[in-house]
């Protein structure tokens, strides 16, 4: 029996755009506009937005809110495979992460940085495989101003006499980004949630 939450890596899909977003913000190209025609042809392969939607001239904020594959592919190709690879590594992608209850693994290899692999990796497809738990850890690090914390199973253990015998502890795993970068990504995450009337954040 494998737990899908932390033992079964899968293609992360658009949630991986959080990783690409880090590099977009850190490179200072978030104000640049991309012409989104609904698809992008790379090495003879046409890759489309979900539903084939075209969004016209969009910057980082609108590209994130619309979840534009074309925008993120374009930005990843501008940044280059090495930067995208380093972004993934900053979130411990491709590493074995030892937790109290399991070791979580992911597959993250840009395979010599071919353009089609770079482009599809940018929006969570390609060869990338990640567990839902690790994607939650990536999201948590953004919410926590760039500090990724180690998950633990329990807050405390209390015996029959009401005495606490063991406590879970917060432990920092890695710094993934600067607080200013995290704040900018949090801002577009809020905008995305509110644009779909999912919540008011």
Q: What are these model-derived regions, one by one?
A:
Residues 1-14, 19-201:
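Beta-lactam-recognizing serine transpeptidase/beta-lactamase-like catalytic domain environment
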């Amino acid at each position: 029996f494998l737990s899908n939450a932390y033992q079964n890596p899968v293609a992360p899909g658009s949630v991986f755009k959080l990783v690409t977003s880090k590099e977009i913000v850190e490179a200072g190209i978030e104000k640049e506009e991309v012409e989104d025609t609904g698809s992008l042809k790379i090495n003879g392969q046409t890759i489309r937005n979900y539903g084939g939607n075209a969004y016209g001239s969009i910057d980082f904020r609108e590209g994130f809110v619309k979840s534009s594959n074309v925008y993120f592919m374009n930005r990843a190709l501008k940044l280059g495979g090495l930067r995208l690879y380093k972004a993934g590594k900053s979130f411990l992608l491709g590493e074995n992460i030892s937790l109290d209850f399991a070791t979580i693994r992911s597959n993250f290899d840009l395979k010599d940085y071919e353009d089609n692999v770079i482009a599809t990796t940018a929006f969570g497809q390609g060869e990338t495989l990640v567990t839902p738990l690790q994607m939650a850890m990536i999201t948590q690090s953004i919410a926590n101003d760039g500090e990724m914390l180690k998950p633990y199973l329990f807050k405390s253990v209390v015996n029959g006499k009401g005495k606490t015998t063991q406590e879970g502890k917060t432990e920092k795993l890695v710094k993934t980004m600067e607080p200013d970068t995290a704040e900018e990504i949090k801002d577009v995450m809020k905008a995305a949630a509110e644009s779909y009337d999912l919540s008011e954040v």
